[in-house]
Amino acid sequence: LTIIRRNTKRMANRKQKEEVTLYFAYGSNMNHEHMKMRCPKSTYLRKMTLPDYELVFRSVADIQKAPGKKVEGALFEITKDCERALDRYEGFPHLYIKQYVDNVMFYTMVDKDNVYPPGEGYLRTIMTGYNNCDISTESLIDAVNESLTALDKSII
């Protein structure tokens, strides 16, 4: 897990006010404007890489274990209120469940059976998030192409 050093003094001051959780976003929540609407008290810290996972689409973004691969995303500090709002947005615990790596929380889909491409508007939201975080869209485009290939194979 690659995390650049964080400003521990700022986090310590914030923790005195409210307990926070480190949250890794890899889909639509990377979009800073959308994240602020869902979680006004969230703080974007930096881009982050989650090793041994890959981005896939099941209509919406998901990640799955994939040794040797990586997922780039956004690291946020979120409050308990933010986490509850994200739980509702992500359909926790029915659509997504929470997982943790090195005390960083992220959501993964419960149903891992089908790969299916995202809608155009949803994809634009994610692309904006990639731009917000200064992350190359190469892996995003690869994941979309994989989902389109899977769809083509299911039609044939």
Spans of features found by a protein language model:
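Short, Lys/Arg-enriched N-terminal segments with co-localized hydrophobic residues
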Residues: L1-R10
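Glycine-aromatic micro-motifs
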Residues: A12-I156
